Design a protein with these regions (language model features):
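Bacterial N-terminal signal peptides that target proteins for export
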Residues: 2-12
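C-terminal segment of classical bacterial N-terminal signal peptides
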Residues: 18-27
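The feature marks proteins involved in alpha-glucan
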Residues: 29-44, 81-137
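Aromatic-rich carbohydrate-binding modules that target alpha-glucans
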Residues: 46-91, 104-111
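Small-side-chain structural scaffolding
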Residues: 10, 26-29
Length: 137
C-alpha cells in the first residue's frame, strides 16, 4: 500500500511539473491584431445611446479595456447597427469580452458577459448579436 501511494505521488508530481512547464493551448494562439465587426439587432430598433464595452481577457492575470469610453456603432445594415474596431495585442490574451451597454452603464443588454473565443486566422472576425440573447452568432 505504501509503495502504491509513493508511485501515485511521483506520477502526480511529474505531471504537475510538466503542466507548469508548458503554455496553455490558448496562449499565443490568437492573432496579434483582430479586426472585429459586430452586428447588433434590437427588436424595436431603439439604438440611441447603446454601445459596446470590449476588453482583452486573460483567464489569469490583468484584463485590458479596448477603449475607456466604449466602442460606438458607426454604421447600419438590414440586420441593425454595426461597429468595427481594430484590436491590437490579442496574441497575449485568451479571448475578448463584450458587453452591449446603454450609455455609461445605465443598463446591459444581457446580464452575463459574452466572450469571443474564436478569431479568424487573419484576425478578421465578424459576429452577430441580438437584444436579450446571450448567444454570439
Amino acid at each position: 500500500m505504501r509503495i502504491r501511494t509513493r508511485k501515485y505521488k511521483a506520477l502526480f508530481l511529474a505531471l504537475a511539473t510538466l503542466s507548469v512547464g508548458f503554455p496553455t493551448i490558448a496562449s499565443g494562439a490568437n492573432p496579434e491584431t483582430v479586426k472585429l465587426t459586430v452586428h447588433y439587432q434590437r427588436v424595436a430598433a431603439d439604438y440611441a445611446s447603446w454601445n459596446l464595452w470590449l476588453w482583452k481577457n486573460k483567464l489569469t492575470g490583468t484584463d485590458d479595456a479596448v477603449s475607456t469610453t466604449g466602442v460606438q456603432f458607426t454604421g447600419d445594415d438590414a440586420y441593425g447597427k454595426i461597429a468595427t474596431v481594430e484590436i491590437t495585442g490579442m496574441d497575449k490574451f485568451d479571448d475578448l469580452g463584450i458587453i452591449v451597454r446603454k450609455g455609461e452603464w445605465l443598463s446591459k443588454d444581457v446580464p452575463d458577459d459574452r466572450f469571443i473565443t474564436k478569431f479568424g486566422a487573419d484576425g478578421v472576425t465578424e459576429i452577430w448579436l441580438r437584444q436579450n440573447d446571450p448567444t454570439i452568432y
